[in-house]
Amino acid sequence: MAKKAMIERWKKPKKYKVREYTRCHICGRPRAVYREFGLCRICFRKLALEGKLPGVRKASW
């Protein structure tokens, strides 16, 4: 989990629009974030396996 101060700093509006970047809505991780869900790969996998993301299934081929 991101520290409370980091989350508060992340929520503040940026001075310049180009400085904004995607972060996970749950843990605040800045890397490997899926834009469509707003989640990092770790949180995405956890929620998908729990069945909390509608329409997401584990791939099988």
UniProtKB/Swiss-Prot annotation:
Binds 1 zinc ion per subunit. GO terms for cellular component: cytoplasm; small ribosomal subunit. Keywords: Metal-binding, Ribonucleoprotein, Ribosomal protein, RNA-binding, rRNA-binding, Zinc. GO terms for biological process: translation. It comes from the Bacteria. The keyword Metal-binding applies. Zn(2+) binds at residues 24, 27, 40, 43. PROSITE patterns: RIBOSOMAL_S14. Its cofactor is Zn(2+). One of its GO terms (molecular function) is structural constituent of ribosome. InterPro entries: Ribosomal_uS14, Ribosomal_uS14_bact, Ribosomal_uS14_CS, Ribosomal_uS14_sf. Gene3D superfamilies: 30s Ribosomal Protein S14, Chain N. The keyword Lipid biosynthesis does not apply. It holds the Pfam family Ribosomal_S14. Belongs to the universal ribosomal protein uS14 family. Zinc-binding uS14 subfamily. Binds 16S rRNA, required for the assembly of 30S particles and may also be responsible for determining the conformation of the 16S rRNA at the A site. Part of the 30S ribosomal subunit. Contacts proteins S3 and S10. This is Small ribosomal subunit protein uS14.
